[in-house]
Amino acid sequence: MKKRKELNALIGLAGDHRRKKTKQGSGSHRLLRTEPPDSDSESSTDEEEFGAIGNRSRFVKGDYARCCKICCPLCAFVILAACVVASVGLVWMQMALKEDLDVLKEKFRTMESNQKSSFQEIPKLNEELLSKQKQLEKIESGELGLSRVWINITEMNKQISLLSSAVNHLKASVKSAADLLSLPSTVEGLQKSVASIGNTLNSVHLAVEVIQKTVDEHRTTLGLLQGSMENNGSNQILPSPSPPSELDNKSHSESAKQDILYLHNSLEEVNSTVVEYQRQNDLKLKGMSETLSNLTQRLSLIESHVVALSKAEQRTNVSSSTMENRAATLKRESLVTNRSDTVQAQSMKKEDNSNSQVSELREKLQLISALTNKPESNRPPETTDEEQVQNFTSDPSALPEFSQLLRNQIETQVKPLSLPGISSIKDLQDLFHKTGQDVDGMLTYQELWNSLGSAMPRPESLRAFDSNGDGRYSFLELRLALGI
């Protein structure tokens, strides 16, 4: 590039001299050249172009020098200003760092002093915590602590409740003084009722035995009927019988077979009813034995309390607390006796119902025996068997009606109910405790429905086991209803 610039400069300086020489020696050149005169114009144009190029290069060089003169100081000023600003910033940052370092040093010093003081205060705090823990333990389990205060409060509540119950028992004992005088008569009545219950149970056992004997007799009559039917079939194999008599014999034999089947079914149902009655009687006997044991225990308690009361009346210096307790126990025993009276009345009613059912069964069995035991003296010797079958099966609809009646009676009176969630005596006791009552209490249908839900049976089905018809069910009634 430098060589190019030097050539351009030399060409620019030599341009003027050449122009002058061309003007002076244009003729000599023309003489020396072999070219035509028109070539002078071409050479002149070339020279003009070369001169223009030289002038242009000189102008570019001057502009470049001027730009350098302006830009160099400006760049130097900018660089100097940037250096000054950077130095000022560095100085300011150094000052800020020194201040921050001083602040950090002061903080470290304060932290060290605080740590030293905290190390000295830690054992003091531990001692204070231990003392406070000891004070809390004294407050909780000391002689005047919270536990002792709570025990005293509970004891006071118990004493207050005992005093209130004693006052209530005193009030009730004042009212039940007349009942205490009539205790011996009530005890005698209970003994008589227990004896009557035993007699009724014995009569029920005898009735069941009689029913079993009648069932055995009916079985023997059925065997005789079957033998007579077989003899009738053997007698029917005779020569040349008329066609209508054969048809009659076939119809009579079929009807006799149907009647025998009906009799078998009825006897099976009677047997099932007898078994159910035996089961019910066993349950009733168990319940009665339990009630008798409870009654004997309660009677012994009543007698002991009566003796204690008689002795207490003779003594004049008996304390009021013992009198209150005895009056309370006597009131409880009177309530127990009243409940036992109600239970006995219910059991008597149930026994009456069972006796009525047994009498109905006896009547129906007598009807069966009357149907089966027709007199045979007024019959001719040839047609005795056929007439016996005809008389026995003259009313074939009576046997299914009788079996239907027995079935309905079994389903309505013997079939136990089912309560949801109750399958044993313990579950039934839990139900009574859940409703807030003892085993001696009574439950209504609404209380049973509230405790067992919508799966309860209808009130009509439970009403069959309500002996006194008051709409309240005792433990024994629900036990009989469930068959447990």
UniProtKB/Swiss-Prot annotation:
Domain of life: Eukaryota
SUPFAM superfamilies in the cross-refs: EF-hand
Biased composition (Polar residues): 228-239, 315-324, 335-347
Calcium among keywords: yes
One of the record's GO molecular function terms: metal ion binding
InterPro entries membership: EF-hand-dom_pair (IPR011992), EFCAB14 (IPR042352)
Every EF-hand domain range: 423-452, 453-484
Start and end residues of each stretch annotated as Disordered: 1-48, 227-255, 313-395
Keywords from the named record: Calcium, Metal-binding, Repeat
Biased composition (Acidic residues): 37-48
Binding positions (Ca(2+)): 466, 468, 470, 472, 477
Name of the protein this chain belongs to: EF-hand calcium-binding domain-containing protein 14
